[in-house]
């Protein structure tokens, strides 16, 4: 194998490693985003429920007052 072929092979191997690394990093970032989005959704639901409970309590208190 000539030097240019060896250089081409080394270059392709370097690029393959870089692409594999980029794919792994992208996958890890996407997985983290899915988890973060799920936690955010759960938190939003909990806050909504708490807000509704507070509003219900306030309405009940107003009804008792008048």
From Swiss-Prot:
Polar residues composition bias: residue spans: 46-58
Keyword Secreted: yes
GO CC field: extracellular region; pilus
Domain of life of the native organism: Bacteria
Record's keyword terms, sorted: Fimbrium, Secreted, Virulence
Name of the protein this chain belongs to: Hrp pili protein HrpA
Organism whose genome encodes this protein: Dickeya chrysanthemi (Pectobacterium chrysanthemi)
Residue ranges, annotated region (Disordered): 46-66
Lineage of source species: Bacteria, Pseudomonadati, Pseudomonadota, Gammaproteobacteria, Enterobacterales
Protein family (similarity comment): Belongs to the HrpA type 2 family.
Chain coiled-coil ranges: none
Compartment annotation: Secreted; Fimbrium
Record flagged with keyword Secreted: yes
Function as written in the Swiss-Prot or TrEMBL entry: Major structure protein of the hrp pilus, which is a component of the type III secretion system (T3SS, Hrp secretion system) required for effector protein delivery, parasitism, and pathogenicity. The hrp pilus functions as a conduit for protein delivery into the host cell.
């Amino acid at each position: 194998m000539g030097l240019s072929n060896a250089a081409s092979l080394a270059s392709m191997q370097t690029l393959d490693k870089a692409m594999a690394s980029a794919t792994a990093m992208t996958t890890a970032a996407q997985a983290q985003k899915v988890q973060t989005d799920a936690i955010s959704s759960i938190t939003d639901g909990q806050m909504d429920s708490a807000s509704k409970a507070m509003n219900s309590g306030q309405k009940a208190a107003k009804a008792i007052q008048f």
